[in-house]
Amino acid sequence: MFGFRFSVKCAAAALAAVLVTSGSTSLQAQFSRRRETNANRRARIERTIQDTYSHQWEAGGGGGYLRFRSGELLQKNNEVTFWLSGTRYFNPKLGVVGEIRGAYGNAKVGNTIFNIKNPQISQYTFMAGPNYRFYMREKTAISVFGTVGAGVGKFDSGSKNIPAEQLGLWPSETRAVFSVGANIDYSFYPNLAFRVTPTYLGSTWGGTVQNNLGVNLGVVYRFGHIK
């Protein structure tokens, strides 16, 4: 009887040892697979980041909104905008950007002796400057830019041949303009992204500085590779 009990205990101990060993081996295998999966995921993300931000060129375009002061004593008016840009990157972070913008709106001239209300105005800017991309992730990136150039103001296009100055508007002329802002990109693919750009535009029509704020939206296409 004693021998039978001893045999049962030995068998139970052996079975427990087998189960513990099997469970430990299974846990080790799961941990190894999880570690390998995490490593593969990190490697994939790094490859995507490399593929996305090793492009040498970016071309973009879209539309937006600008809050603009059209005369020294006039209220600010809302304008719709378009933008086209091209950027050449020397490395994944530093590049130079050239940009064309246009803005269209109706000036708030109030009551005048000419019986003209809210004449149409437009401005076109041509600027270039450095662009620095300081945040790069698999799907998102943020860059900042500073540009300077020339702005063409057309403030008498809707004034029915009345000089813009007589309506309280800036004179139609070409003046210096400058801008700073941030590009916030969301990448659908390594070569295609949606862009949101909060921006400041400084203009100097009439010999004074106008501080204008706006936001642009659009798409960006990336191509070529940095050598």
Over which residues does each language-model region extend?
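Short glycine/proline- and aromatic-enriched beta-strand/turn motifs that initiate or cap beta-hairpins
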Residues: L27-T87, G224
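Gram-negative (and chloroplast) outer-membrane scaffold detector with strong preference
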Residues: T87-R88, P92-P163, N216
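Residues that define the transmembrane beta-barrel architecture of outer-membrane proteins
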Residues: H55, K76-F82, Q120-F126, S172-F178, ...
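Outer-membrane beta-barrel "beta-signal"
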Residues: N211-K227
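C-terminal segment of classical bacterial N-terminal signal peptides
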Residues: V18-L27
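Residues on the lipid-exposed face of transmembrane beta-strands in outer-membrane beta-barrel proteins
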Residues: G61-G63, L84-R88, A128-Y132, V148-A150, ...
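Repeated loop/turn-to-beta-strand initiation elements of outer-membrane beta-barrel proteins
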Residues: W57, K93-G98, R137-T140, Y186-F194, ...
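Extracellular loop and loop/strand-boundary signature of outer-membrane beta-barrel proteins
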Residues: R69-E72, V109-P119, P163-W170, L201-G207
